[in-house]
């Protein structure tokens, strides 16, 4: 499974910088950057904080995809 996110898109829609979103959810800006690039899997607690900050559901923000094993 690969985790893809819509954090960057939804963050931009709300007019938030990475720094502002990071402050809202209690993490460093780099954590938001890694989440947006798909290089970090958030804890359930962090995922819930992000959903509240971006006013979206978990399945609107986080998309699980099957890996192509070719």
Predicted regions span which residues?
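Short alpha-helical DNA-recognition segment
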Residues: 16-34
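Alpha-helical residues within the helix-turn-helix
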Residues: 12, 23, 52
């Amino acid at each position: 499974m690969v985790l893809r996110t819509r954090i960057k898109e939804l963050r931009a829609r709300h007019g938030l910088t990475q720094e502002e979103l990071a402050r809202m959810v209690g993490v460093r800006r780099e954590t938001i950057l890694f989440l947006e690039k798909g290089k970090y899997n958030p804890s359930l607690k962090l995922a819930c904080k992000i959903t509240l900050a971006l006013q979206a559901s978990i399945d609107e923000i986080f998309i699980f995809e099957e890996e192509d094993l070719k």
